[in-house]
Regions:
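Positively charged
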Residues: 20-202
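Bacterial N-terminal signal peptides that target proteins for export
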Residues: 1-8
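Enrichment for repetitive, rod-forming helical segments
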Residues: 10-13, 112
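Hydrophobic h-region of N-terminal signal peptides that target proteins for export
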Residues: 13-19
Length: 202
């Protein structure tokens, strides 16, 4: 009986210690090394016709945990993605984490539908609604330099994501050109490039 009580107490203690342990981030060592390598500088953009780069660009990305979103590594990634997409030598209107070698569900989108047209980050982003109303427009991509093509997109979408500050799940309804940016960037998170969707009639 004493042995059973002792074992029970040990189990309780182990459970308590485990519950108090600090959660660990899910970033891989390779991801951490790549993010730290650039140390708050712009990152190298992966190119679609580079064989090694293409392997990453075509991957299905992984979600972040809440612990990831609260980490310094995540903050550094955001800073460096922003520096990359705003690089005056090759500026863009959106960027996805896979484009800088990080296969995670994170995008930055320039919100042309908001005052001052800010760049905003969306973690674990998914599009949960596509309108039947479509639009055809010319698109380019930082990962596909010196090329453009016409793509059909929904006029309005609803994007679901995690707010990187509050960690709350949110949705946002977006229309017009900004919705096109969202669709383009979320495609990156699923290993899809705009050249996969070129409109045949234009």
């Amino acid at each position: 009986m004493k042995k059973i009580k002792k074992l029970f107490c040990i189990c309780i203690m182990l459970t308590f210690v485990a519950s108090c342990a600090k959660p660990t981030i899910s970033f891989t060592n390779d991801e951490i090394e790549l993010i730290n390598k650039y140390s708050q500088q712009k990152m190298r953009v992966l190119i679609y016709n580079n064989e090694n780069d293409s392997l990453i660009l075509r991957q299905q990305t992984k979600e972040f945990s809440n612990t990831d979103l609260q980490s310094d590594i995540f903050e550094n990634l955001k800073i460096q993605m922003l520096l990359t997409v705003q690089d005056t030598s090759n500026a863009g209107v959106g960027i996805a984490a896979p484009q800088v070698g990080i296969s995670r569900r994170l995008i930055a989108v320039q919100r042309f539908d908001k005052v001052d047209e800010p760049f905003e980050f969306y973690a674990n982003a998914y599009i949960v609604y596509y309108s039947d109303e479509k639009r055809i427009g010319s698109e380019g991509c930082l990962s596909i330099p010196n090329l453009r093509g016409n793509v059909e997109r929904s006029e309005t979408i609803v994007v679901k994501y995690i707010d990187t500050e509050t960690l709350k799940p949110l949705t946002d309804t977006v229309s017009g050109f900004t919705s096109v940016i969202f669709q383009h960037e979320v495609d990156h998170l699923d290993g899809i490039l705009y050249i996969d969707k070129l409109h045949p009639d234009v």
